[in-house]
Amino acid sequence: GPGAPAAQDSEGIAITRSGHMFISSEGLPQREPRLPPSVIEYTRRVDYVGPLTIPPKFLQPPAGPLTHGVRENQGFESLTLTPDEQRLFTASESALAQDGEGASFTRGTTARLLEFVSEGGRFVPRREFPYPLDPVPPVGFTPRFMINGLVELLALGDTEFLSMDRGYAEEAGDNGRRATFIRIFRTSLDGATDISAMDSIRGRSNLKPVRKHLVLDLNAVKELPPELRVAALDNFEGMCFGPTLADGSRTLLIVSDDNFSPRQRTWFLLFRIVR
């Protein structure tokens, strides 16, 4: 609609019960002037309402070295509304440039989880929390690129979530080997430090991070189709609740992004939630 940005790297979507939509974008930091990460609001008829206010610490300089804000292709992958629709959450996929380095085989890193609160009919930024990410799991080759990042959130309540972490490493060359690691956690904000007043958390050792408990390691699921062999799990980065089964069990649906690549596929996997 009028006023909407002409280009986006859209990733997450959250829809209210009335059909109102919010769409997160990683932005386009690889071009100058840079398009910043965003969460954009649309009506039920997909009319453009406008962007939510993003705290400056997530924003990159308009040109020059990326010394501040989200790194390239590591912005707002995730997006979720709480069940009462009073809070909206997204997160940087990995550490902000001023917060620290990304994950490697020998070190983890810390992403920032960002809360918006509904006030007067609009969502405004409120708190931020340190979200810990593990080191990239070992692979049997020397990668040219590696990452472990937070790619999806699914709210269970005001402070409880399912979160999806995706690790990835790739070898140089068009036919280089790849490895993907998908893990889903039950996540709690209870007791975590609000870091919204801190432009940088680099070197801070007294922060209490978001608490995480592993509930699904996709690489360890033996019932996956043969094409989804452990060493080449696809690019899973979406998650929502699926249909309720006949016995009353809830389900979880996860989806992969094929990146328009002939080497990848779009998969939908449905899991029964066992309490």
Each model region followed by its residue ranges:
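Sequence/structural signature of beta-propeller domains
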Residues: 1-275
